[in-house]
Amino acid sequence: MSFTNTPERYGVISAAFHWLSAIIVYGMFALGLWMVTLSYYDGWYHKAPELHKSIGILLMMGLVIRVLWRVISPPPGPLPSYSPMTRLAARAGHLALYLLLFAIGISGYLISTADGKPISVFGWFDVPATLADAGAQADFAGALHFWLAWSVVVLSVMHGFMALKHHFIDKDDTLKRMLGKSSSDYGV
């Protein structure tokens, strides 16, 4: 398996970004759902949001690097067996996932910095606040963050089901390419 993408398959770096992002996004979603259930006296009441913020900032940084990687090492093109509608749906779905992830990160940043304080990322560095005393900002961003998170989870589940559909029903190599396998549709 190559480090970079080829016309036939995704490389190690793209596959690692893909699967690591999925694990982190689902973990962050679970953490977010759990932390809103905590009472003020729970030991994790302050720790969980700090963890969520730190991982969220690192995820955003990783997302920027991932987008740059797509420019440096473009993903394989669509399989020849894809219909025009499948090609359009795949492009729209991938674009929507990226836009949702960026919007979740931005809304999380707005929630976290509404009090004018920077976000400490595991004590390694701080991300400065750009706006101060924006209580309404936090409320709006919080509602947006919630619905965007649910949207990315629903869309990513659909993304996974489509990969399984391609693998088990269409019997093409869509899923195999993300796992670093050769695509028989390309005669490899």
Curated annotation (Swiss-Prot):
Residues 1-15, 76-91, 165-188 are cytoplasmic. Its cofactor is heme b. InterPro entries: Cyt_b561_bac/Ni-Hgenase (IPR011577), Cytochrome_b561_oxidase (IPR052168), Di-haem_cyt_TM (IPR016174). Residues 37-54, 113-143 are periplasmic. One of its GO terms (molecular function) is electron transfer activity. GO terms for cellular component: plasma membrane. Heme b 2 binds at H52, H145. Keywords: Cell inner membrane, Cell membrane, Electron transport, Heme, Iron, Membrane, Metal-binding, Transmembrane, Transmembrane helix, Transport. The chain crosses the membrane at residues 16-36, 55-75, 92-112, 144-164. It comes from the Bacteria. One of its GO terms (biological process) is respiratory electron transport chain. Belongs to the cytochrome b561 family. This is Cytochrome b561 homolog 2. It comes from Escherichia coli (strain K12). The gene is yceJ.
